[in-house]
Structures are given as C-alpha cells and as structure tokens.
Amino acid sequence: MAEVINGILIREVETKNIMTKSSLPVGGYSVNPYVGCTHACKYCYASFMKRFTGHKEEWGTFLDVKHWPEIKNPKKYAGQRVVIGSVTDGYNPQEEQFGNTRKLLEQLIGSDADILICTKSDLVVRDIALLKKLGRVTVSWSINTLDENFKNDMDSASSIERRIAAMKLVYEAGIRTVCFVSPVFPGITDFEAIFERVKDQCDLFWLENLNLRGGFKKTIMDYIAGKHPDLVPLYDEIYNKHNRSYFEALEVKAEKMAKKYDCAFVDNEMPYGRVPQGHPVIVDYFYHEEIRGTENTGKRNR
C-alpha cells in the first residue's frame, strides 16, 4: 500500500526484526523505525540506502513505515548500545502520525539498554516521560550552524532554535543530551558560537567533519561554488586534494576551547553519565574513520 501525503510517498512495509547489529563505531544495535528520511539533508550519508531498498525516488521524498513483531525479550539488550536513527530520523514529521518510534521505546522499557536517539527534531519532547522510564537514554541533536538561512539551504528539519529549546527541556528533565556539531562545514560552521549557546544544557559536545563522497559531493561542491565562492579553494584543497590540515587545525582549536571552559576533551564518547552543568565533554570526532572498535574508551586507535 502506498499513498502520497504532503508530497511524501508513504509505504507501509513488514520487517522480520527491527533490531539490527550495528557496524557503527558506537557498536551495539542500530534501529530504524522508518526507511528514508524526509528532512532531505543535502549532505546525508544515509542516501546510499536506496541501493539496498530499491527506491527510485529522490532521497527525502519517500518514507517507508516499518511494521515489526513485538520485541518479546527486551532484556536481551541489557547493557547494549541501541542507536535509534542511524539512517533515518525517528522523529521525522511523520512520526506524529504513525508513532513508530514511540512504539519502539515502549517495547524497550525494562531492557536496561543504553539507548542513543539521533534527531534533528523537537518532537522528541513529546516522549520525555517515556524516556525517563527507560533510564539510560541519551538524546543527540545535530546542530552545525546558528544561521537559519544556511540550515534551510541544507535541510527541512526543525529550526535550530526549536532544536536548542528541545535540548534544554530534555536536559532539565534529567536525560543526558548531546549537541552533535555535524557535519562541520569548513569556513561556515562556528562551533565555538554553538558551544556558547548550548554548553549549559548538554553533557556531550560532539564534533564531526564534513565528509563528501558519492552523489552528494557534487551537490555540496556546487552549493559552495554558488553561495560561497570564496571558499571554493579551501573545499578543493580538502575534498579534491585530500589535505587534512584544516581539520587538524580545528582539532587544536577544539582542544584549546576545552581548556578554556574546563571541559574534558576526548577522541570518542565516554561511558554513560552526566557532567557538571556548563562543562560538557567535548568529543573530537574529526577522525571518526580511525575510531571503529574504540567505543566507550574515549581514545582513538593510533
């Protein structure tokens, strides 16, 4: 069954198991209540999923609503990292209608899993009471700019101000929060300005560089040429000549920022926990391709 709702092609599909072993550096399980994502981010790495799902539609214009057998033994995932939204956003606008993410969270009550929710939405505040029942939960918002115009050029998700407001509400409810500054656009993303806005309402401040590969490399390079022509030489140096010195300099800047604000500075996420307000752990994920297998150690393989 398929129908078009507000310009999005919606299908309802059956899946045998909603829990999938993850190949992400954070390990554990990857759980995606939907196929596709209607935020239509221009830099989205998850657009590669079309190769496996058979979708011909443009990324961001379709959404498959999954139906799965109830999770009968949630305790099976005790102590495991469960990432919700690795290749979708569980709180996309359609979640308000279909409620798949809420259903998933209800099925994980009592699991004692270490749950990480990745989103660009403020809809997550709807489920604060439910998240508190789950215990070990972290909610991460992607915020890579304070400029709403640039944000609107890149995605159709909630405004930056709405994301920041949602983060504050979730943080004040006692739930661990992350500001995921991803992707850091060279010459555009001012991560210290973002830090100033969110440092009192997040436990982790996570930095990840912009990676350009596949079909969206041309999309972003064309955007830079059209909107930021002064940055073309820098992007050519980084993404065509593979010069990493820009991000090496940003890593140094981030470490200095950590010292300035008396924050821990690590190469990867530390084990679950809250930190003193105003002193979030700053996570250097500029070298995430080197981090695989180091989850919860705080150190990169060197």
What kind of region is each of these model predictions?
Residues 1-138, 146-150, 160-161, 172:
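Conserved Radical SAM active-site core
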Residues 2-14, 192-302:
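Auxiliary Fe-S-binding modules of radical SAM enzymes
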Residues 29, 82, 115, 139-141, ...:
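Hydrophobic faces of well-ordered beta-strands that scaffold small-molecule active sites
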Residues 87-89, 120-122, 142-146, 182-184, ...:
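Active-site beta-loop-alpha junctions enriched in small/polar residues
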Residues 100-104, 127, 162-166, 193-198, ...:
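A general structural detector for well-ordered alpha-helical segments in enzyme core domains, enriched
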Residues 109, 171-172, 199, 259:
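Anion (oxyanion) recognition and catalysis
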Residues 133-139, 199-204:
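Glycine-enriched alpha-helix->loop->beta-strand junction motifs that scaffold or abut catalytic
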Residues 156, 168-189, 240-244:
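Conserved strand-turn element in the central/C-terminal portion of the radical SAM core barrel
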